Amino acid sequence: MVVAVYPGTFDPLTRGHEDLVRRASSIFDTLVVGVADSRNKRPFFNLEERLEIANEVLGHYPNVQVMSFKGLLKDFVRVNNARVIVRGLRAVSDFEYEFQMAGMNRYLLPDVETMFMTPSDQYQFISGTIVREIAQLGGDVSKFVFPSVEKRLQDKVAALEQARAANP
């Protein structure tokens, strides 16, 4: 049985992420989606919200598990007995960072492979950062995220705007 881990912040989980999960889950016996509790990033959605979103969107895949992790990816990979780390590459600009991370992961986990996957054509330009920015500026993100995620984005943006108005 081959277990793979697909780590990320998923802030928010997009149609591009789901595309990779759908395709990777057809390759591996088990795909563990690792939602990172990263100290280096200031997420728009907190960890609990990101886990809820991931479970809402990905819950229908029988061989996909959604879990959070903190600390080094190598420890999460080991705990889950994974043999593969799945990473998405949207553009050449992603490659340099991902290549360096794959090299470090190979050093730390010599028996674990990193597999790069490119998103389907219609999702190559989508990123969580761009989706958040569009949502915060009042734009339509319905083509980039699932309806439940769009609703959460709208609610979060409205709450932030109310908080700003209350504390000018």
Swiss-Prot record:
Its EC number is 2.7.7.3. The lineage of its organism: Bacteria, Pseudomonadati, Pseudomonadota, Betaproteobacteria, Burkholderiales. It is found in: Cytoplasm. It comes from Paraburkholderia phymatum (strain DSM 17167 / CIP 108236 / LMG 21445 / STM815) (Burkholderia phymatum). GO terms for biological process: coenzyme A biosynthetic process. The keyword tRNA-binding does not apply. Homohexamer. The record marks H17 as: Transition state stabilizer. SUPFAM superfamilies: Nucleotidylyl transferase. It catalyses: (R)-4'-phosphopantetheine + ATP + H(+) = 3'-dephospho-CoA + diphosphate. Its cofactor is Mg(2+). Pfam families: CTP_transf_like. Keywords: ATP-binding, Coenzyme A biosynthesis, Cytoplasm, Magnesium, Nucleotide-binding, Nucleotidyltransferase, Transferase. It comes from the Bacteria. Substrate binds at T9, K41, L73, R87. Belongs to the bacterial CoaD family. GO terms for molecular function: ATP binding; pantetheine-phosphate adenylyltransferase activity. NCBIfam families: coaD_prev_kdtB, cyt_tran_rel. InterPro entries: Cyt_trans-like (IPR004821), PPAT (IPR001980), Rossmann-like_a/b/a_fold (IPR014729). This is Phosphopantetheine adenylyltransferase. Reversibly transfers an adenylyl group from ATP to 4'-phosphopantetheine, yielding dephospho-CoA (dPCoA) and pyrophosphate. Transmembrane segments: none annotated. One of its GO terms (cellular component) is cytoplasm.
